[in-house]
Each structure stands twice: as C-alpha cells, then as structure tokens.
Amino acid sequence: MSDNAQLTGLCDRFRGFYPVVIDVETAGFNAKTDALLEIAAITLKMDEQGWLMPDTTLHFHVEPFVGANLQPEALAFNGIDPNDPDRGAVSEYEALHEICKVVRKGIKASGCNRAIMVAHNANFDHSFMMAAAERASLKRNPFHPFATFDTAALAGLALGQTVLSKACQTAGMDFDSTQAHSALYDTERTAVLFCEIVNRWKRLGGWPLPAGEEV
C-alpha cells in the first residue's frame, strides 16, 4: 500500500475502483421487461488533500425499448410521460454509450482499474443499467458486474437512516421532496451524501489507516 501521505487519490481510496453515482427512473421493477425512462450519472474526484467531491454530471431521458412494459403505477409514482416529445429522449444505447465514454476517460485519468456504481438501494439501479447495457449490446462496459457501493447501507451505518431524504437531512444536507424521483436530483443528492459519508470517516480519523493497519 502507498504511504499515508500519498493516499489522496481515488485509486488508493477505493482499491482501484472508480466510483460513479447512478440513479434511474423506470416503468416498473423488472429490469428485464420494464422500461428504463431516465438515467443520471455523476463521476467523483478527490482534491489534493483527499476530500471527495462530485465532478461531471450526465443526464438523459430514455426511450422505452421495443416491447417494454410500462406499468401505470410506476408512471404515476415518478410522473414521467414516456410519450412526451418534450422529454428529448434518446435510445438506451446513446445514453449508456455517452455515460460509459466519460467513465472510461475518468478511470484512465485517475489511474483506476474499473468503475463501481454508487446508488441508493443500488441493486435496483444496477440491475436496470446492466439489463439496458445488454439490450444495447454495449461494448466495454466499464462497470463491475455485481459489486456496488449502496448508500442506503452506508447511511444506515454512518447516520442511522436508510431513506435517502432522511439520511440527507441527518447529514445536514438540504432535500427537496418536490424534486425527488427525478433521476438527476436523486443522483445529485446521493453523490453529495456518499461524499459526506466518505469525508466524515476521514475527518473522524478512519482514513488513512493508522500505521500498522495498512495492507
């Protein structure tokens, strides 16, 4: 492992993983059959002192894939009209291709080896993104096929809250419930929450590891 003084890089902090915050809005709960309707991604960076912060934001409204299910209950919940021409929706391929292109550049620039998804209740977002990547025959998917950083679990440990809005408020962050269930807003809040948890652990002395505990 590097000397403590050198542990200010993303690649050192997360064992070579490049964290990317993701949130999706969908037309149901089944990643194989229900439409992906919106996706946002935020890459992260560290400053020279090793503090984590948001970096680049990408956001796309997505066209339902051919034959996709559109559950009325899900659409009522997130307020998305898939047929609204003003959404400016793009294909799954276009959205994921652009996200992955930026992510691959970030991996290279940071000296990391692979991207890892950060999301709130991450299994849901991960399953939809991976299913969409498979449908789009996306080449060179930079994301780990199953590992994630789940901010619901991390916030439960660090803050005693698992609901995104309550975790943000407990951490001293603003949360506007009227903007919730927008992929862009939820990704922004999740990114700031993840950074706060990581940085709080650093402020408390948990990172870098004390001498003798490095591996």
Curated annotation (Swiss-Prot):
<dbReference type="GO" id="GO:0016896">
    <property type="term" value="F:RNA exonuclease activity, producing 5'-phosphomonoesters"/>
</dbReference>
<dbReference type="Pfam" id="PF00929">
    <property type="entry name" value="RNase_T"/>
</dbReference>
<feature type="domain" description="Exonuclease">
    <location>
        <begin position="20"/>
        <end position="194"/>
    </location>
</feature>
<dbReference type="GO" id="GO:0005829">
    <property type="term" value="C:cytosol"/>
</dbReference>
<protein>
    <recommendedName>
        <fullName>Ribonuclease T</fullName>
        <ecNumber>3.1.13.-</ecNumber>
    </recommendedName>
</protein>
<comment type="similarity">
    <text>Belongs to the RNase T family.</text>
</comment>
<comment type="subunit">
    <text>Homodimer.</text>
</comment>
<keyword id="KW-0269">Exonuclease</keyword>
<feature type="binding site">
    <location>
        <position position="25"/>
    </location>
    <ligand>
        <name>Mg(2+) 2</name>
    </ligand>
</feature>
<feature type="site" description="Important for substrate binding and specificity">
    <location>
        <position position="124"/>
    </location>
</feature>
<dbReference type="InterPro" id="IPR036397">
    <property type="entry name" value="RNaseH_sf"/>
</dbReference>
<feature type="site" description="Important for substrate binding and specificity">
    <location>
        <position position="146"/>
    </location>
</feature>
<dbReference type="GO" id="GO:0008033">
    <property type="term" value="P:tRNA processing"/>
</dbReference>
<dbReference type="InterPro" id="IPR005987">
    <property type="entry name" value="RNase_T"/>
</dbReference>
<keyword id="KW-0460">Magnesium</keyword>
<feature type="binding site">
    <location>
        <position position="186"/>
    </location>
    <ligand>
        <name>Mg(2+) 2</name>
    </ligand>
</feature>
<dbReference type="GO" id="GO:0003676">
    <property type="term" value="F:nucleic acid binding"/>
</dbReference>
<keyword id="KW-0378">Hydrolase</keyword>
<dbReference type="GO" id="GO:0045004">
    <property type="term" value="P:DNA replication proofreading"/>
</dbReference>
<feature type="active site" description="Proton donor/acceptor">
    <location>
        <position position="181"/>
    </location>
</feature>
<keyword id="KW-0540">Nuclease</keyword>
<comment type="function">
    <text>Trims short 3' overhangs of a variety of RNA species, leaving a one or two nucleotide 3' overhang. Responsible for the end-turnover of tRNA: specifically removes the terminal AMP residue from uncharged tRNA (tRNA-C-C-A). Also appears to be involved in tRNA biosynthesis.</text>
</comment>
<dbReference type="InterPro" id="IPR012337">
    <property type="entry name" value="RNaseH-like_sf"/>
</dbReference>
<keyword id="KW-0819">tRNA processing</keyword>
<dbReference type="GO" id="GO:0000287">
    <property type="term" value="F:magnesium ion binding"/>
</dbReference>
<feature type="site" description="Important for substrate binding and specificity">
    <location>
        <position position="29"/>
    </location>
</feature>
<feature type="binding site">
    <location>
        <position position="181"/>
    </location>
    <ligand>
        <name>Mg(2+) 2</name>
    </ligand>
</feature>
<feature type="binding site">
    <location>
        <position position="23"/>
    </location>
    <ligand>
        <name>Mg(2+) 1</name>
    </ligand>
</feature>
<dbReference type="GO" id="GO:0008408">
    <property type="term" value="F:3'-5' exonuclease activity"/>
</dbReference>
<keyword id="KW-0479">Metal-binding</keyword>
<feature type="binding site">
    <location>
        <position position="23"/>
    </location>
    <ligand>
        <name>Mg(2+) 2</name>
    </ligand>
</feature>
<dbReference type="InterPro" id="IPR013520">
    <property type="entry name" value="Exonuclease_RNaseT/DNA_pol3"/>
</dbReference>
<feature type="site" description="Important for substrate binding and specificity">
    <location>
        <position position="77"/>
    </location>
</feature>
